[in-house]
Amino acid sequence: INKNNIFYSMIIKNLKKNNRLDETELFGPILNVQKFKDVEKLKKELNSNNYGLSCIIWCSNKKNSEKFINNLRYGRVWVNGNITQNYPQIPIGGFNWSGIGRETGKSAIYNYSEFQSTIINKI
C-alpha cells in the first residue's frame, strides 16, 4: 500500500469553513471536531455537503440534540455514541452521493422486491 493512502488515527479541530475535509467522504480513523453555537446554522452547513452517510453528535443537552437531528440529511446519526454501536434491525444507507438503497433492517428487503400498483375502477 502506498504510504500516501494510509491515514493514522487523528483528531482535527477548528478547521476553517469550506475546507477540503468537509467536502470529502472519508473512510478511516479521522474525527473532525467542530464546536457550534447556532444549531440551525450548523445543520444548514452539514446538509449542504454532497455526502450524508453518517454523523456523530456529542451534546450534553438532550433537547438540543433532538432539535439538531430533526431534518438532518444523514443515513445514520449517533448521539453521544459511536460507529461501533451497530444494530442489525436498523437500516444502513446514506443520503445524497453516499449511496442509494439500504442494507440491513426491514427496508433492505425492498431492494430485492418488485412492486406493482393496480387501480380498479367501479363499472
Residue ranges with predicted function:
Residues 7-123:
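Conserved C-terminal structural/oligomerization subdomain of aldehyde/semialdehyde dehydrogenase
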Residues 1-2, 82:
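Short, solvent-exposed loop/turn elements at beta->coil junctions and helix N-caps
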